[in-house]
Amino acid sequence: MVERILNSEDISLLISGRQSNPHKLLGIISENSSQDRIILFRPGAHSVAVELQGNIEHATHHHSGIFSLTTPKGTLLNDYRIYHQNGLLAHDPYAFSPLWGEIDSFLFHQGTHYKIYERMGAIPCDVRGISGVLFVVWAPHAQRVSVIGDFNFWNGLVNPLRKVSDSGVWELFIPGLDEGTLYKWEIVSASGEILIKTDPYGKGFDVPPLATSRVINSDRYVWHDAEWMEKRSCTQDQPLSIYEVHVGSWQWQDGRPIGYRGLAERLAQYCKEMSYTHIELLPITEHPLNESWGYQVTGYYAPTWRYGSPEDFQFFVDHLHSEGIGVILDWVPGHFPTDTFALAHFDGEALYESVDHKEPLHPHWHTYTFDYRCNEVVNFLLGSALFWLDKMHIDGLRVDAVTSMLYLDYGRKEGEWSPNIHGGKENLDAIEFLKHFNFIVHKEFPGVMTFAEESTDFPKVTEPINSGGLGFDYKWNLGWMHDTFRYLKVDPIFRAYHHNDLTFSIWYAFKENYLLPLSHDEVVHGKGSLLQKVPGDTWSKFAHMRLLLSYQICQPGKKLVFMGGEFAQGREWSPDRSLDWHLLDNPYHATLHKCVAKMNSLYRDLPYFWQGDGKQESFRWIDFKDTENNVISYYRLSGNDSNQALLCIHHFSSGYIPSYVLHCQGIKMCQLLFNSDDIGFGGSGKGNRPPILCIDHGFSWGIDIELPPLATLIFLVRFSN
């Protein structure tokens, strides 16, 4: 009977699971001038009941799961509902017109659909007054795409999607489904292979390792941070002291990590007590492997379910904002893992991954790199960034592994990479992507910060795009970090021969807008904790810690410290356990903790540390040549106050100097603000003697101070007119 109105080849494709346009066979089909016919496909069902205008009818079973029911001419989608095999009574998914429009296709295939997260994936919505979920996915090489879940007993033949774009977008609106529905994609590749995949645009996933997508309404949460969102602004001339956090190992309770909601209050209170302005989260985008720390992402639009739901994460951000703490997210657009359930060979072909290299896997991480030539891939990544800023109210994005994106030969040997069109090693497509990313982030979300983890001297990373730069707000100064650690590892007796490691970074400190990181990367993989990096006995180690952290505070650039560094975590960090908070019962750790809180509050309150700190005018050497005593000294200046400055002195040797004369002209007042050797901070109590002004014939030419071992002194000085 249905063969009279349907093409037999189309029926065969539907039954065999290779039909790309099921809507032309299913739903309401005009049979003749006097009647319509509802055609249903229920493979494996023996009967199908239909509620037609309030009456229960049973459809006729033809063969191979095809059912039909004759209806009056002009039957509409609201006139009937179907009893599904799971008991759900809902409207017919195949009676709806396409919801993915031409403008969607145009923008997506141009790579500029900046609200793509509201159009791709699983979107709870109402269509013509009927609630359900719109499923949309990009799979251009697929013969067939179906959505599978409990609602169809994970049978890929039941709910095939319609191909609505020549470039491979598929969609299906399923009425009656709601938030929390679990689903995956079943994809038939061009070769006929059946693939089961999670949703690239999924907003939630089951707790790993289950890797099942979950329908999420990202707009359900009611935010309370309007005041914060309105006033947040560019931090170039504001204090920026970042506490880097791995959510799963900051604090545990009852043998497991504290979830988003429980963590919110504790972490906000802690950051306030320690005077941190922001936290930076190691990636909480969904990831299957805990040991990857979140850097091998399979869910670019979803906070990991390990610590709670997306709504719990929204509460977490909201609460930190209410306490005046910003939230920065590590974001990984450079590479993705090879897990077969996710992005890798998504529709049976290389789709998201680049095929430019002879060896497709990146040699450092054995992951795929993204194809930045493909507009749809670019749109996927841009959409992820904008999703976190829009729906999750994130205040900044730190882009991981930028260097690996910028250079085609990064980690590759000769012959393993191909030069760009100019014969160079720069990845021109990745460079354009990063510019596009920074442009649209700053355009759509003024005040949001972007950070580049970039380890080479690639030019103009923080220059504006219209000046030829990449457009980042800040670049991690990894050179400063490595030089500092290399210097501090040397025994103080021999540091005179390594003085250049201490001073070199200042000569390029104003080339970019820098952030000075003491990050997680330096306390893993056998590198030891910060405490383990510095030499000496216990007292000397903690003196070194006070010196290191105060030196970081005083140097030009924004600040970042990985959790545990602020109280000298003793052992190397692991993502599989809590920090050793019990160490705060030890006076050494407790007094360092107190010292860091004091330093952070000074940094936050004194504009000399941060106002214009990306400009040469904010810094002036006093003496960088005292290799005999391992001392450097300099002024930190604020553009608004030329009559005063901070005088910072760092003593990197273990000897005590009761009288140290510093040649600094024109000082008429010198007040000690901070001494890292204070007894209250665990020090020896040296360095608190009031400074003596050195004056000849009424001319102030220097100061005489007491210089404690392994210590930082910070003075507020006032100059003569």
From Swiss-Prot:
Pathway: Glycan biosynthesis; glycogen biosynthesis. It comes from the Bacteria. It holds the Pfam family GlgB_N. Keywords: Carbohydrate metabolism, Glycogen biosynthesis, Glycogen metabolism, Glycosyltransferase, Transferase. The active site is at D400, E453. It is an enzyme of class 2 (transferase). Signal peptide: none annotated. SUPFAM superfamilies: (Trans)glycosidases, E set domains, Glycosyl hydrolase domain. Its EC number is 2.4.1.18. NCBIfam families: branching_enzym, PRK05402.1, PRK12313.1. Monomer. PANTHER family: 1,4-ALPHA-GLUCAN-BRANCHING ENZYME. Belongs to the glycosyl hydrolase 13 family. GlgB subfamily. Catalyzes the formation of the alpha-1,6-glucosidic linkages in glycogen by scission of a 1,4-alpha-linked oligosaccharide from growing alpha-1,4-glucan chains and the subsequent attachment of the oligosaccharide to the alpha-1,6 position. This is 1,4-alpha-glucan branching enzyme GlgB. It comes from Chlamydia felis (strain Fe/C-56) (Chlamydophila felis).
